[in-house]
């Protein structure tokens, strides 16, 4: 078959497919209108840089997992706030029945515009999510959490009844159904997940996430979030030092990490990240305990500089802009190459 005949045969096949399934159902990759991946900021400057595209990708499944009280819900509330700033409509499926509206408001979430559902069963939660995604009007949906998506059979059964892998089957079926809708409607779908311990693991990491393996495969980005220390004001604990690691990334190189502070009552400390990344990129100078910007001292001690940046937002925004411009030069934000690469 000559090249001309091949081209005619392909053109005829493409025309037949479009006739059967609609325009745009098949095309050459270079003809796609949006080749660049759009992203929504996470609310953390360091994590945006670690993700490689300035935030979480639109039209993809994201998994955020970690131990209890590590900042999973806080990070997702920041995601909602950032999406709303861009005019997006967000939904929160609260399967844990634990969302605090007052805390969400403090983090910048417009709770009057946030759609919330507190379903009774896992099937109900995922059906609600599917309906909202297929509507095409939702820009971001959060499901909190996978562990709380209890199958109907388990709720209606007796305590102690064996329900072998019923949650894993539910998640596998739901993700098969949701994936195409998520991509078509460009909706960011974030699953919060918990950590469990595998029994009898002698070597390697005994930790695993709930809900089986389906979510690990379908997720384009998986973020591991951990609390690594406390932030104290004299004797009072006022926040948590947090480390996040991008353990899977289909849109940029994975295994990058970022550190940030989560302050109780106000969420991720943007000013703390600006100081740390500013020093790392030689934008902010550090001499002893003093910090300087443009040869002007802006404070002694990290907490004082954070307060200075809060009081001078124009300087804070200026430093942040320079950090984002230089971020392409950062190949490493505490880059942590571990055994997980070989998992």
Swiss-Prot record:
Which keywords does the record carry? ATP-binding, Cytoplasm, DNA damage, DNA recombination, DNA repair, DNA-binding, Nucleotide-binding, SOS response
- Recorded family membership: Belongs to the RecA family.
Q: Name one GO molecular function term.
A: damaged DNA binding
Q: Which organism is it from?
A: Rickettsia felis (strain ATCC VR-1525 / URRWXCal2)
The residues listed in the UniProt record as binding ATP, with positions renumbered to this chain, are 66-73
The yes or no answer to whether the keyword Cell cycle is present is no
Q: Which PANTHER family match?
A: MITOCHONDRIAL DNA REPAIR PROTEIN RECA HOMOLOG-RELATED, RECA
Q: Does the keyword Cell inner membrane apply?
A: no
What are the annotated GO cellular component locations?
cytosol
Q: Which GO terms describe its biological process?
A: DNA recombination; DNA repair; SOS response
Q: What is this protein called?
A: Protein RecA
